[in-house]
C-alpha cells in the first residue's frame, strides 16, 4: 500500500507540473511546445536518476515517487501522439515530422544528457 501511495503522490505533483507547463508555454511554430518541454524534462530526470543509481544509492521509495509517479505523470506519450495525429489531420506534414523528430530524438538525447550529468554528480 505504501508503494501505491508514493506513486500516487509523485503522480499528483507531476500532473500538476505538466498542466502548468502546458498552460504557460504557448504553441511555437505550430508545434505543441509545452508537451515537448515536459517530455524533454522528464526524460532528463529519468536518465539522471537511473544512471545516478548506478553510482550512488537511490532508494526504492524515491524511484517509485520520482520515476514512476512524478515522471510518469509529467511526461505524456498519449498527448504527444494525439497532437501529432491532429497535426496530420490538418495536413501539417512538415510540422508533424518536426514534432515527432524533436520529441523522439530530443528525449533520447535528454536521457543521454541525464546520464552524463549523473556521472559528474557522483
From Swiss-Prot:
GO terms for cellular component: plasma membrane. Na(+) binds at residues 72, 75. GO terms for biological process: cellular detoxification of fluoride. The keyword Lipid metabolism does not apply. Signal peptide: none annotated. The keyword Transmembrane applies. InterPro entries: FluC. One of its GO terms (molecular function) is metal ion binding. It is found in: Cell membrane. Keywords: Cell membrane, Ion channel, Ion transport, Membrane, Metal-binding, Sodium, Transmembrane, Transmembrane helix, Transport. The chain crosses the membrane at residues 4-24, 36-56, 65-85, 100-120. It is a multi-pass membrane protein. It catalyses: fluoride(in) = fluoride(out). It comes from the Archaea. Na(+) is not transported, but it plays an essential structural role and its presence is essential for fluoride channel function. Belongs to the fluoride channel Fluc/FEX (TC 1.A.43) family. Fluoride-specific ion channel. Important for reducing fluoride concentration in the cell, thus reducing its toxicity. This is Fluoride-specific ion channel FluC. It comes from Methanococcus maripaludis (strain DSM 14266 / JCM 13030 / NBRC 101832 / S2 / LL).
Amino acid at each position: 500500500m505504501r508503494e501505491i501511495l508514493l506513486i500516487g503522490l509523485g503522480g499528483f505533483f507531476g500532473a500538476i507540473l505538466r498542466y502548468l507547463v502546458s498552460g504557460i508555454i504557448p504553441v511555437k511554430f505550430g508545434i505543441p511546445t509545452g508537451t515537448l518541454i515536459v517530455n524533454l524534462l522528464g526524460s532528463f530526470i529519468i536518465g539522471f536518476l537511473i544512471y545516478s543509481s548506478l553510482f550512488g544509492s537511490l532508494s526504492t521509495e524515491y524511484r517509485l515517487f520520482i520515476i514512476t509517479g512524478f515522471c510518469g505523470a509529467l511526461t505524456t506519450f498519449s498527448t504527444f501522439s494525439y497532437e501529432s495525429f491532429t497535426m496530420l489531420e490538418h495536413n501539417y506534414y512538415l510540422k508533424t515530422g518536426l514534432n515527432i523528430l524533436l520529441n523522439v530524438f530530443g528525449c533520447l538525447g535528454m536521457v543521454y544528457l541525464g546520464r552524463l550529468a549523473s556521472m559528474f554528480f557522483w
